Structure formats: C-alpha cells, structure tokens
C-alpha cells in the first residue's frame, strides 16, 4: 500500500453539525447555486407565509427587493413562535427560542404537525433554516401579542439573541436576507422570475393579497396580485387575448378521502378558438411541470366524459374519426390544483406528482362535475364537441401533410443544400446555424462565416404566422418546411426529438428595421409554439448586428444601440470640454464634469419614467404646489374615459381609492420618493433643481472647449447642455447607420456579428411561460383590440429617431 494513501477507517467519517451540511452541499437542498437556487430561497420564505394563508391565518404577503440587493418578505400571519423550545433547550443546555430552532435546525417547523397545517408546500421540507444557512445576513422580526421581537444571523449562526424591540400593533413575520456571494454564482434577483411565482401563488390561493416592489428600479411600479376568483381567474387571465368559446371558465372542485387523509382537487377549464393546449398543474401550490397523477386523472376523465356525451347524444353520425385526447384538448386552457396531506414527488425538484390515490380522486371529481355541467349547459357542450371534431379532421389532414413533407424531403434532398449552407463539423454541440433574412445577407454571411462550425440558412421574406395557422398549413409553408428539415429534430409534441437536433445554437440574424423585427418575432413564435424544447433547452439566440459604424480618421468602432451611441457622443463631447457656472464662477472639468453629466442623465431617466406613464414632464412641472411640492401619484382614468388628477400624499391616495370606482380609475405611482429626493439634492449642489432641465435659468452655464477657446457656448437649461455636448461629440466623426445586413460586407459581418470572440448574442430563455403565452397571443393572435391597446400604451416610450418609416 502506498504510504501516501490515507486509511479509510472510522476517522474518515465526517459528521456535519447543524446547518454546515447545507453550506457544504447546497445543491442537495436547493437544486443548484445559480439563478434557480437563488430564487428558491425566496420561495421557501414565501411558502411559509402561504402555509399560514392556507391555514386561514394570513391575508397579505409583501415581497420587496431592496436597493442594496437584499430582499424582505413580510406577512400578517400568526408570527413564528418566540417562546422557549423545551426539547432543544434541554439538548443544548441553554434557553433556545422556537424562532431560533426554526431558523437553525433542518426539518424543524409547524408543517410536520398536522394540527398546525393540514397541507403545506415548501421545496424539500428544509424551509427557512436552509435560507438562513445560505445567507450572508438574515434578520427575523416577529410581531406577536402586541410586541416586536428580533434576531439576527450570519450564515446560519446567531449574531444576536432574541431581543424585545418595541410595542407594536402589527401581527406576523418579517424576514430580511442577503444571499451569500460565497455560495451563489449570482446574488442578483430577477424580478420577472419572482413575479411569475408570486402571481401563481395569488391565483392558487383565492383571496390572498401579494404585493411586490423593486427598490432598485425607479421606473418600476408596485404590483399587487389579488384574485378573488382563484384559478378560475387564472384561466380567464390566460385566455384574455384569445377568442373563448364561452364566457366563464368551467370551475370544478371536490374533496375525497385518500390514503393519508382528505385530498382537495380543483380545476378550471375553458376552450378557445386557437390550436394550442395550455394546461398548468400544481400540487400543494408547487408547479408540477411534468404533470403526474393529478393531471393523468384529469385528462382521463375529460376524454371519457366528452366521448360519453358524444355517444349518448348521437353526435358522431357524420364524423367517423376516432377521437384522441389531443383532439379534445386542442384550444383548451386549464389550471389544475390539488392539495395532498402527504405529497410524493418524483425527482428532487418536485416536477411530477406520484401519489397513486390522487388519480382516482381527480377522475371522480372531474367526471361527476363535468357530466352535470354538460347536461345543464348543452349549448356549451355542443360548441366543445364541434371544436373537437374539427380538430380531429385537422389532425388527419396534418398527418397527411407531414407524411408528404417528409416523403418529399427524402426524395428531393438534393434541393436542401441549395438553401442550407452547411458546416464541416458534424458534432451538434460544436455547431451553430444562422437563420438569415434574405439571399443578399445570406451571401455575405456565407462568405464571412467560419465554415468549420457555422451553417447559414437564408429565408425569403416573412414566414407564416403560426399563431393563426393549423399544423396542416404550417407543413405546406416552404420556408418553415426548410427550417424543419435543416434542424432535423421534427416538430410537434409527438414528433419532436431534441437528440436529433443538428445545431446546438440556432441564431436568428435579421435587419435592424421594422421588417427585420417582424421576421424575428414570427420565427420566435414558431419556435415557441412548435419547438418549445429548443427555447427551454436554451438553443435559440438573437444576433445583435451593429446599428452604427463611427469613423474618425483611420479609426472606427461599431455601436449596437441608440443608448450606446448617446453615451459615446457625450464622452467625445466632454473629453476636451469644461463647464462654467457664471453666477458662482464654479468650473467643472474631467471627473467633476462627468459627475455633473451623470446627474443630468439621472434627470433624463426620471423624465423617461414619467413619460412612459403618459405624464409629460412639462405638465408635471406645472403641477408644483408651493409648500407641498410635486405630486406623488396620478389617478388615471380607464381607456376612453376623462378626468385624471394628481395626488400629493398617501392620505389623498387612500381617500381617492375609497371614493372612486376602482374599475374606472387606477393609481399610478409617479416615482420613488427617495430617488427623487436624491436627484434634487444632487442638483442643489450646482444651484439647480429638477425644473432646470426644461425651464431657462438665470444661472448661465458656459461650455468651453480646449480646442476652440473662442467658441464658448452659453446654455440656460440642462437639456441644452446635453444636446450641445452630443453635437460637439459629432464633430470630426463620420456616422453610418446600418438598416440592413446587406449593407455590410463579409468581413464586417464576421467582425461584428459572427465572430464568437467579439459578437453580442441575446439568449432566448423562458422565465415565465404564462407571460410568454400572453405576449405571443396578444402580438400575433387574431384579437385586434388587445394589440391596439398595447401599442397605444407603449407608444410614448418609443423614441422618434428609432422609428423606421
């Protein structure tokens, strides 16, 4: 035996005490230490509050991302117990509060006591103690029995004992934590991920109010999630931009006794005129993306009830096709939620429910309720049946079209290389395919590419809008057929096979004009609706060709966006410049000048925030009241109504909410007060205020330039200062704006857009499937009014010089 080898005996066995195991192997407890694991920390804390709500003790949860990167979760539940925990105190030989036990001992909490909670969620039962272990700092505040208590921890270890803070009328628990950068690859919370989950929880728990805020972004308004209709409201939300077959979603609920106690099952369902099935399933509020026994039971009962109804009413006399579950679920939007006392999940991340008794409960509840509904609502039942028959006929037609496409593709494969310019590499993991707009750009891309691993697929014009088309029509579209054949992985739920994908990266490269944006959206719609796994597995990217080429003598650089262009021009304009405030003789150069410019840019950002909310800055300035200041809120009328007004305090806001009919008006928070005060304070240092941006000041601002000392320029508003410096930056440079890829030669295309060492790609990911479906339906679907309303509400945020006319 090599003496260097260590003996494997009892001394090699390590026992990790307390929360040390969580810190040593965090992936075992939260899945990973990336963006997913980071957000699971928030879910664990929120799930505790939801458990309180499900038990009937909590009606409101507030989640707020702090400006310094922390996050705070507050509820109005019973509050975590703070009394001495007898068993743990005896074990440790000191007084240990129940709060400390909950926050420092794995698998400790009320959810393991069926008298406290009948059902509960949570990730793996490790709860808030896991959050504590993986946080650089955590502060728990409990409001209970008219008193406030607090305790602080660092990486799971108590920093302060449980302390009485003050008298308080509040009730509940507040958790503030900061993720540990030693554990997580990123500690930056993504609000879209959090909002998706909070919205789900508000839908799944009828009547609870969840409020979300993000202090990092001055333009972000507080969002309140409250849905009295529960999952019925969820289905209405999912179908809001679709043409529903009937007005109100069907709601089904029932309770049956399972192996471990009562199982509560509820479902809401509604068909629309579209062709996509959209079904979300949950168990104890946890999304089960791979379904499980509750979804199987629901689908089985749905198919059986509809087939039975067709047979009982002799509705199939002119339709001899055998119906499938796929036919029945075409255009179906449904949400299924089950509450199980002892849920059994398959896999560590709870993707699939495994309780066998849930399937029979779902079949009983759905079967009985849907049968009664169809008998009581024969018109709705007939509309559903008619749609099912049309879906079956379309399925047969699509099957023939698919077979024809595959047969034609096999017999006429020599035609494919004429479109697809393939690469030499055969390992899909090393290959990428550019989908390029037009033959001209395709030619440049072919010449500029690295032929070893980059394939080029030019497409002509705008492809079919698949949001408005059945599969039969999709298979008949030449451009889509070419894309399907080039990728090699098939299409649709039954025929898609990711392992046959020929290119690991699919890069959409279109022009920077309106047509290019439209083609990109059509392609993304196709991938999202019919090759969703490509987006879920992060195979789709969007190329970012430059918008400008800026040349100065022999030097040049490429610029990707208007914002980058503005920054570059300002940098050039301030390099050799100075600013003199005439009234005080104060002069700014170098870093001091840059700081002043940044203050002006903060003012511009503030103005943009207002104008995105349809509040003109000039109007905002006019609303100033002596002794009160600027307004805080705007009471906005509903679309097509008149009579908005400004509000100057929280008291005015509360009065307005009490007096006005809330469906006719909405309260818009104009800005974050702290941010506004900070901008005002910075401006005061220069003898200015917020109105200085537009209203001419007595304090003359003189811009001087070292290259031309005699060409000083006097400004009287901050807007003039910014515009003059940008114009100064334009002197001596040549600016070329690219509208099409064809305007670049092969070398330029390679240098800017195709070279992996230098290019910028946008990674297409699916953070919020509900919101993605909502956006694609609104922008690409049949319903015009929602699209018009979206365009009208966002029109003010479009810069005029970005419009392609």
Curated annotation (Swiss-Prot):
Annotated binding of Mg(2+) 1, by residue:
437, 511
Q: What is this protein called?
A: DNA gyrase subunit B
Cited function: A type II topoisomerase that negatively supercoils closed circular double-stranded (ds) DNA in an ATP-dependent manner to modulate DNA topology and maintain chromosomes in an underwound state. Negative supercoiling favors strand separation, and DNA replication, transcription, recombination and repair, all of which involve strand separation. Also able to catalyze the interconversion of other topological isomers of dsDNA rings, including catenanes and knotted rings. Type II topoisomerases break and join 2 DNA strands simultaneously in an ATP-dependent manner.
Which organism encodes this protein? Answer: Chlamydia pneumoniae
CDD domains (UniProt xref): HATPase_GyrB-like, TopoII_Trans_DNA_gyrase, TOPRIM_TopoIIA_GyrB
Recite the UniProt cofactor note for this protein.
Binds two Mg(2+) per subunit. The magnesium ions form salt bridges with both the protein and the DNA. Can also accept other divalent metal cations, such as Mn(2+) or Ca(2+).
Query: What biological processes does GO assign it?
Result: DNA topological change; DNA-templated DNA replication
Q: Which GO terms describe its cellular component?
A: chromosome; cytoplasm
Q: Write down the chemical reaction(s) this protein catalyses.
A: ATP-dependent breakage, passage and rejoining of double-stranded DNA
| Pfam families documented for this protein | DNA_gyraseB, DNA_gyraseB_C, HATPase_c, Toprim
Specify where it is mainly localized: cytoplasm
Quote the subunit structure annotation: Heterotetramer, composed of two GyrA and two GyrB chains. In the heterotetramer, GyrA contains the active site tyrosine that forms a transient covalent intermediate with DNA, while GyrB binds cofactors and catalyzes ATP hydrolysis.
């Amino acid at each position: 035996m090599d003496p260097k080898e260590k003996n494997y005996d009892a001394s090699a066995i390590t026992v990790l005490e307390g929360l040390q195991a969580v810190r040593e192997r965090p992936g075992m407890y939260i899945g990973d230490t990336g963006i997913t694991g980071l957000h699971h920390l928030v879910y664990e804390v929120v799930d505790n509050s939801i458990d309180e709500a499900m038990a009937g003790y909590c009606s409101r949860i507030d989640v707020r991302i702090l400006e310094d990167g922390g996050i705070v979760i507050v509820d109005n539940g019973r509050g975590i117990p703070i009394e001495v925990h007898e068993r743990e105190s005896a074990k440790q030989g000191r007084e240990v509060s129940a709060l400390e036990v909950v926050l420092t001992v794995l698998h400790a909490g009320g959810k393991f006591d069926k008298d406290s909670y009948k059902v509960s969620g949570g990730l793996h039962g490790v709860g808030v103690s896991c959050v504590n272990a993986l946080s650089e700092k955590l502060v728990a505040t409990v409001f209970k029995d008219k008193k406030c208590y607090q305790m602080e921890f660092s990486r799971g270890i108590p920093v302060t004992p449980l302390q009485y803070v003050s008298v308080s009328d509040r009730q509940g628990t507040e958790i503030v934590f900061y993720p540990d950068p030693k554990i997580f690859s990123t500690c930056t919370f993504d609000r879209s991920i959090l909002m998706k989950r909070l919205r789900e929880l508000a839908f799944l728990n009828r009547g609870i109010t969840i409020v979300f805020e993000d202090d990092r972004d001055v333009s972000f308004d507080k969002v309140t999630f409250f849905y009295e209709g529960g999952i019925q409201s969820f289905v209405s939300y999912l179908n809001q931009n679709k043409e529903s077959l009937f007005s109100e979603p069907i709601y089904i609920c029932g309770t049956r006794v399972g192996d471990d106690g009562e199982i509560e099952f509820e479902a809401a369902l509604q068909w629309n005129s579209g062709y996509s099935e959209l079904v979300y399933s949950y168990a104890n509020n946890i999304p089960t993306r791979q379904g499980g026994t509750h979804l199987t039971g629901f689908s089985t009962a749905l198919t059986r009830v509809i087939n039975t109804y067709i047979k009982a009413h002799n509705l199939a006399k002119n339709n001899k096709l055998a119906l499938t579950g796929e036919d029945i679920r075409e255009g179906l939007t449904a949400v299924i939620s089950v509450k199980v006392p002892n849920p059994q999940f398959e896999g560590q991340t709870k993707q699939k429910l495994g309780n066998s008794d849930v399937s029979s409960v779902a079949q009983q509840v759905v079967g009985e309720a849907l049968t009664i509904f169809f008998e009581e609502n024969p018109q709705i039942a007939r509309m559903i049946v008619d749609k099912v028959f049309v879906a079956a006929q379309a399925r047969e037609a699509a099957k023939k079209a698919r077979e024809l496409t595959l047969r034609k593709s096999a017999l006429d494969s020599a035609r494919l290389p004429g479109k697809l310019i393939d690469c030499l590499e055969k390992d899909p993991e090393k290959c990428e395919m550019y989908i390029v707009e037009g033959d001209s750009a395709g030619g440049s891309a072919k010449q500029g590419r690295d032929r070893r691993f980059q394939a080029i697929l030019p497409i002509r014009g705008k492809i079919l809008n698949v949001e408005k088309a059945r599969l039969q029509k999709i298979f008949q579209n030449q451009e889509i057929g070419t894309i399907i054949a080039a990728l090699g992985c098939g299409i649709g739920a039954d025929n898609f096979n990711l392992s046959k994908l020929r290119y690991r990266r699919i890069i959409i490269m279109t022009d920077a004009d309106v047509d290019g944006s439209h083609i990109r959206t059509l392609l993304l719609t196709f991938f999202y609706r019919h090759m969703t796994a490509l987006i879920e597995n992060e195979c789709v990217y969007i190329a970012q060709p430059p918008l400008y080429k800026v040349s100065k003598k022999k030097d040049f650089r490429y610029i990707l966006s208007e914002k980058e262009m503005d920054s570059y021009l300002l940098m050039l304009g301030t390099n050799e410049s100075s600013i003199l405030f005439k009234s005080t003789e104060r002069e700014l150069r170098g870093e001091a000048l840059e700081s002043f410019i940044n203050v002006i840019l903060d003012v511009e950002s503030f103005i943009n925030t207002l104008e995105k909310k349809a509040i003109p800055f000039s109007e905002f300035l006019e609303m100033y009241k002596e002794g009160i200041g600027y307004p805080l809120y705007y009471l906005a009328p509903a679309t097509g109504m008149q009579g908005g007004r400004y509000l100057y305090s929280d008291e005015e806001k509360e009065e307005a909410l009490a007096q006005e009919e809330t469906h006719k008006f909405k309260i818009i928070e104009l800005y974050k007060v702290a941010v506004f005060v900070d901008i005002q304070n910075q401006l005061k240092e220069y003898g200015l205020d917020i109105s200085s941006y537009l209203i001419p000041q007595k304090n003359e601002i003189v811009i001087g330039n070292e290259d031309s000392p005699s060409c000083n320029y006097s400004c009287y508003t901050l807007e003039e200062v910014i515009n003059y410096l940008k114009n100064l930056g334009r002197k001596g440079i040549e600016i070329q704006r690219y509208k099409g890829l064809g305007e670049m030669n092969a070398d330029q295309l390679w240098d800017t857009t195709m070279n992996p060492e230098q290019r910028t790609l946008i990674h297409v990911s699916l953070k919020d499937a509900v919101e993605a479906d909502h956006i694609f339906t609104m922008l690409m679907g049949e319903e015009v009014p929602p699209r018009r309303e979206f365009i009208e509400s966002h029109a003010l945020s479009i810069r005029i010089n970005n419009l392609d006319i």
